[in-house]
Amino acid sequence: PSLAIVSGQGGAAGQRERMAELVMMAREQGREVQIIAADRRSQMNLKQDERLSGELITGRRQLLEGMAFTPGSTVIVDQGEKLSLKETLTLLDGAARHNVQVLITDSG
């Protein structure tokens, strides 16, 4: 799969801004977007941003509970440094099987 790691600094507002930019970039490529939040707090924080209101935002647990990957889409992982090894392998395996682009943000 296509994989990129996007590193950046900043608190919750900075993370939302970075996420909105990545979503816009993926949309400009004609891709559907799925967002995986680091935890429930981040998930709620992202859902409050109007720019992300139409996006599917799930938690990391969804990876291990059978996340459905949309072929040809983009999956954006918030705070990717918090993924476990098993979650990372599940993500990359699913992405490879469904030709999914993966963008992982690293909050530094």
What residues fall within each predicted segment?
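Conserved ATP-binding/catalytic motifs of P-loop helicase motor domains
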Residues: 1-108
